[in-house]
Amino acid sequence: MANPELLEEQREETRLIIEELLEDGSDPEALYTIEHHFSADDFDTLEKLAVEVFKLGYEVTDPEELELEEGGETVICCDALSECALNAELIDAQVEQLMNMAEKFNVEYDGWGTYFEDPDGEGEDEDDEGMDEDDDGVRH
């Protein structure tokens, strides 16, 4: 199970991200692409995690190398993507699920991010917006 202190830090970070997006005028009714970030020291370790995360229903990006600013060390990174409403409880459930998975595979969970959604955006399908009331955030 993920470290309770780290989970609490992530919960606080989630609320801060949501608050800042909404204060900046991001659309509260939009579906957001949530990018959960992972890193590992080697490709094989990250690949094992990526396969399991994909089986849970997340889209997983191709791994890429990233040189860290401090020390010049290179890590392998990927993201797990989901679409959901900007709802703290849904995102908390995903974060906990993915932090537990990362711990299982000895991979770093590096938080999540998303993008500003313009409430006046054109070309959006209204049927895709909003929160699915049956969505508990956990992917199966």
Curated annotation (Swiss-Prot):
S-S pairs: none
Matches recorded under Gene3D superfamilies: RraB-like (3.30.70.970)
GO MF, one annotated term: enzyme binding
Ranges annotated as biased composition (Acidic residues): 117-140
A family per Pfam: RraB
GO cellular component, one term: cytoplasm
Disordered: annotated span: 113-140
Entry's localization field: Cytoplasm
Keywords (A to Z) from UniProt: Cytoplasm
Function field: Globally modulates RNA abundance by binding to RNase E (Rne) and regulating its endonucleolytic activity. Can modulate Rne action in a substrate-dependent manner by altering the composition of the degradosome.
Subunit composition and interactions: Interacts with the C-terminal region of Rne.
The protein's name: Regulator of ribonuclease activity B
Lineage per the UniProt record: Bacteria, Pseudomonadati, Pseudomonadota, Gammaproteobacteria, Enterobacterales
